[in-house]
Amino acid sequence: MSTPDPVDPAQFAGTYYEQGSVKQFFSIGLVNTTATYSLNANGSIKVENSGNYFFNGGPQSSIVGSAVPVNADNTALNVGFFGQAPSATPPGNYTILAHAPDYNWVIVSDPTGNSGYILTRNQTITPQEYQQLLAQARALGIRGPITPTIQYGA
């Protein structure tokens, strides 16, 4: 895995639309998937993931957790869900591999490269933009099969 540029949590905060991911058991069939990050007063980051199952307006799935940086560049985080308080101990389970200078897109994974997400601020992107981000995700070490995520309504 490559060394990413430092992350400014304030600029990173906000809503991202999942354009593609290595599907996990809990995300199979999800569409309109988003990840929203906000800063907590204690320095941790609130993580809110949501989407609809199978179709636009389908049953909603959402989960809320928190994350804490585990390195000085804020590129490695430990994320905890289900009330689990994340530890600030490296190596972290969530790595921001790359981001646009304006945080218009981010590519994230875990330290092994077996999971991966392509996230953008825009709900839809062009096929060319998707292919560029997909190629970059592969070059950064994401090994799992990344499949597109359907985003309706844009």
Which residues fall in each region the model found?
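A beta-rich soluble binding module of mature secreted/lumenal proteins
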Residues: 1-154
